[in-house]
Design a protein with these regions (language model features):
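Conserved catalytic cysteine-centered active-site region
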Residues: 2-59, 65, 199-207
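Conserved active-site and cofactor/substrate-binding residues in soluble primary-metabolism enzymes
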Residues: 4, 8, 39, 43, ...
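Short beta-strand segments
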Residues: 60-66, 89-90, 183
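Accessory "access/gating" subregions that flank catalytic or transport cores
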Residues: 175-207
Length: 207
C-alpha cells in the first residue's frame, strides 16, 4: 500500500498523547509495514531488535495485527479468526530478554496464496475503454492445501530448529526451555510439531 497502516496506529497514539507531549510528538519516528503471512510480525521483531542493538538508547514498537478468513464450509473455516498485539523493544528489557541467536528456514512453496488476476476489459466486454484498460480480480479467501501446508510448516520448524542448534552450539537446546510458543492455526498443532522433533532428538521412530 502507498500509505503504511503503521501511520494510522501512530496517528492514534500521537493524538492520545498530544495533551501531555504536544501535537505531532512522533514527528521524528519512522514507521514501516512488513507483510508476510503469519511471520511478518516476527520479521518486524527481528528488525526492531537489530535497530535497538545498534542504537541502545532508542526504542522500537512492533504492532502485529492479522485476520484469517476462509470460504464458508471449507476445511479452513474453523481456523479463521483475528487478533493483534504490541511489543515495546528496548535494550533495558523488563519482562523478556531475547538472545541474539536464532534459527531460520525458508522454502518457496505453494501451499497457500490469494489469487490475483488481471483481465483486459476488451476481453470481457468486447468494447474499448478510455480508462483503466484492465479488470482486477482478487479474492480475500485463500486457495490452500491444508495437509500440504501442515507438512511445509513441520519441515520448516525442523530445519529452523537444526539451524538454531548450529548457531547456538547447543546439542539439545529444548532441555533448557521451560515453555514453547508456536503459531497455532488450530488446537494441538504445536504439540504435533514438537513431538516429532523430540522423537528425532531421542532416537525414537517417528515414521
Amino acid at each position: 500500500a502507498a500509505k503504511p497502516t503503521a501511520t494510522y496506529a501512530m496517528q492514534m497514539v500521537e493524538t492520545a498523547l498530544a495533551g501531555e507531549f504536544g501535537e505531532r510528538c512522533f514527528r521524528n519516528c519512522d514507521v514501516v509495514d512488513m507483510t508476510f503471512a503469519c511471520v511478518g510480525a516476527v520479521d518486524a521483531l527481528h528488525n526492531s531488535m537489530d535497530f535497538v542493538r545498534a542504537n541502545p538508547n532508542k526504542k522500537a514498537i512492533v504492532i502485529a495485527s492479522d485476520y484469517a478468513k476462509y470460504e464458508l464450509a471449507s476445511t479452513g473455516e474453523y481456523t479463521q479468526g483475528g487478533g493483534s498485539v504490541a511489543f515495546l523493544i528496548s535494550s533495558d528489557a523488563k519482562l523478556l530478554e531475547i538472545e541474539n541467536k536464532i534459527g531460520v528456514a525458508t522454502e518457496s512453496v505453494f501451499d497457500f496464496f490469494k489469487p490475483r488476476r488481471e483481465i483486459g476489459k476488451s476481453s470481457v466486454t468486447g468494447l474499448p475503454e478510455t480508462f483503466a484498460d484492465k479488470v482486477e480480480i482478487f479474492t480475500d479467501e485463500p486457495v490452500f492445501d491444508g495437509q500440504y501446508s501442515n507438512q511445509c510448516y513441520q519441515d520448516r520448524i525442523k530445519e529452523a530448529y537444526t539451524h538454531y542448534k548450529e548457531e547456538s552450539g547447543n546439542v539439545k537446546p529444548y532441555e533448557n526451555w521451560r515453555f514453547l510458543i508456536f503459531h497455532l492455526p488450530y488446537a494441538f498443532h504445536g504439540k504435533r510439531l514438537f513431538t516429532e522433533i523430540f522423537g528425532i532428538e531421542n532416537g525414537m521412530n517417528t515414521a
